[in-house]
Design a protein with these regions (language model features):
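Short, conserved clusters of charged catalytic residues that mark active-site
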Residues: 1, 18, 130
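Active-site Tyr-X1-5-Lys
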Residues: 1-15, 37-44
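Flexible, glycine-rich beta-alpha linker
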Residues: 15-35, 60
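C-terminal substrate-binding subdomain of Rossmann-fold SDR/epimerase-dehydratase oxidoreductases
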Residues: 32-165
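Active-site "gating" loop of Rossmann-like NAD(P)-dependent oxidoreductase/epimerase domains
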Residues: 7-9, 27, 48-51
Length: 165
């Protein structure tokens, strides 16, 4: 918020982008979706038992493909209004369990989910979802990549990465 104060005092053009959960190719495996994708690829290649080690699968998040995030940032640079705060999100609440099931179906696998106690966070937010209406209305931006396309891209990325392990 300090930057907004400076924008008013110094007449700088500043906007605040509030990013929610981004996912996409090349993301590190310590994030939930790429971590699961890596495990699914390893299962399909016979490098791991058909069990996904995971934290809490019943929380929800607002995931947005990183390519849509980049487009949102460009839209803000071109059309965003000075001093405004924008949520960069899909506006769709996704349960982690559902995304894992979708990825397993894409991969053609049946897997067991194993809750790994070391991956649980005691102060985990149960639900996270944003509203990107202001961003859409003021810049004309809208997400262009479906969650299914994103999950397919993440799985394809991990296919190549596991080959190099």
């Amino acid at each position: 918020l300090l930057c907004l104060q400076w924008s008013y005092q110094e007449h700088w053009r500043i906007m605040v982008a509030r990013p929610f959960n981004h996912i996409g190719p090349r993301q590190r495996e310590d994030f939930v979706i790429p971590g699961v994708a890596r495990q699914l690829v390893r299962i399909r290649k016979g490098l791991q038992a058909a069990r996904i080690d995971i934290g809490d699968v019943d929380v929800t998040r607002d995931f947005l493909d990183v390519r849509d995030v980049i487009n949102a940032y460009f839209s803000l640079l071109e059309s965003g209004q000075n001093g405004e705060i924008y949520n960069v999100c899909s506006g769709q609440e996704q349960r982690i369990r559902s995304l894992i099931e979708q990825m397993a179906a894409i991969a053609g696998l049946n897997v067991d989910l194993h809750q790994d106690q070391t991956r649980l966070r005691p102060s985990e937010q149960r639900r996270v979802m944003g509203n990107s209406l202001k961003l859409k209305e003021q810049t004309g931006w809208k997400p262009g990549i479906s969650i299914t396309e994103t999950l397919q891209s993440v799985l394809s990325d991990w296919e190549a990465r596991v080959e190099r392990e």
